[in-house]
C-alpha cells in the first residue's frame, strides 16, 4: 500500500485523484483572488501586488520577445503567462505544511504539457496552413524526408514527456526533500530548505514558460520570419 503524507484534503477523502483535484482547484482559486487583488485598484504608480505583477509581466515579455519577437510575445502571453503563474503558485503551495503541490502529480503536469503541445500545433497549422506546416517535418532534403518525418514526429511527441516529467520530477523531489528535512529537524524552522524550494519553484515555472514560447516560435515563425 502506497504511503501518503496527510494533507487538509484528507479530511474529505483519501482518494489520490480527489486530493490532486482538490489542490488544483484550490491553487486556481488562490491565484484568481491574488490576481484580482493586484488588478482591482490600478494606479499610475504601481504599488504592492500591482507592482509585483507588473514586474513579472515585464520580465516575461522581456525574455519572450528575444525568442519570438515582441508582437508574438504579447499575443501568446495570455497562455504562457497564465501557465507560468499557475505553475509557480502550484509549486509554492506545496511548501505549506498540510498542502500538496498539484505539480507533484504527473497526471496534472501531463495535462499542462498536452495543452502546450496541442496549442502550438494548432497555431502552426493556423498560421502556415496544414500542408506547409507539416512539410517542415520532412526537412530541406527531399530524399531524406522518409527518415526525417518520423524522427520529427517522435521528437515532437517526446516534448510531452520531457515537459511533464521535468516539472513533475523536480517538484516531487522538492516536496520529498522538505518532508525529510521536517522529519529530521522538526524543532527548527528550516529556512534554508524553504529558500531553496522557493527558488526552484520560480525556476521550474520559468523553464516551462520559456519552453512554451520556444515551441510556439518553432511552430509559427516561417523561414522568412527568422
Swiss-Prot record:
The chain crosses the membrane at residues 18-38, 79-99, 105-125, 134-154, 179-199, 201-221. Keywords: ATP synthesis, Cell inner membrane, Cell membrane, CF(0), Hydrogen ion transport, Ion transport, Membrane, Transmembrane, Transmembrane helix, Transport. It is a multi-pass membrane protein. Gene3D superfamilies: ATP synthase, F0 complex, subunit A (1.20.120.220). One of its GO terms (biological process) is proton motive force-driven plasma membrane ATP synthesis. The keyword Cell wall biogenesis/degradation does not apply. Key component of the proton channel; it plays a direct role in the translocation of protons across the membrane. F-type ATPases have 2 components, CF(1) - the catalytic core - and CF(0) - the membrane proton channel. CF(1) has five subunits: alpha(3), beta(3), gamma(1), delta(1), epsilon(1). CF(0) has three main subunits: a(1), b(2) and c(9-12). The alpha and beta chains form an alternating ring which encloses part of the gamma chain. CF(1) is attached to CF(0) by a central stalk formed by the gamma and epsilon chains, while a peripheral stalk is formed by the delta and b chains. Belongs to the ATPase A chain family. This is ATP synthase subunit a. It comes from Helicobacter pylori (strain P12).
Amino acid at each position: 500500500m502506497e504511503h501518503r503524507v496527510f494533507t487538509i484534503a484528507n479530511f474529505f477523502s483519501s482518494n489520490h485523484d480527489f486530493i490532486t483535484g482538490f489542490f488544483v482547484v484550490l491553487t486556481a482559486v488562490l491565484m484568481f483572488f491574488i490576481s484580482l487583488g493586484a488588478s482591482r485598484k490600478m494606479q499610475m504608480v504601481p504599488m504592492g501586488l500591482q507592482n509585483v505583477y507588473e514586474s513579472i509581466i515585464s520580465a516575461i515579455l522581456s525574455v519572450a520577445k528575444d525568442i519570438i519577437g515582441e508582437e508574438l510575445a504579447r499575443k501568446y502571453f495570455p497562455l504562457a503567462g497564465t501557465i507560468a503563474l499557475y505553475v509557480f503558485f502550484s509549486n509554492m503551495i506545496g511548501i505549506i505544511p498540510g498542502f500538496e503541490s498539484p505539480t507533484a502529480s504527473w497526471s496534472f503536469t501531463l495535462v499542462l504539457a498536452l495543452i502546450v503541445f496541442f496549442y502550438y500545433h494548432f497555431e502552426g497549422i493556423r498560421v502556415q496552413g496544414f500542408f506547409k506546416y507539416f512539410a517542415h517535418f520532412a526537412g530541406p532534403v527531399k530524399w531524406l524526408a522518409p527518415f526525417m518525418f518520423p524522427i520529427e514526429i517522435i521528437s515532437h511527441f517526446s516534448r510531452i514527456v520531457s515537459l511533464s516529467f521535468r516539472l513533475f520530477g523536480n517538484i516531487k523531489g522538492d516536496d520529498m526533500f522538505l518532508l525529510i528535512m521536517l522529519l529530521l529537524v522538526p524543532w527548527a524552522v528550516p529556512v534554508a530548505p524553504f529558500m531553496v524550494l522557493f527558488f526552484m519553484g520560480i525556476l521550474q515555472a520559468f523553464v516551462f514558460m520559456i519552453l512554451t514560447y520556444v515551441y510556439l516560435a518553432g511552430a509559427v515563425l516561417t523561414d522568412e520570419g527568422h
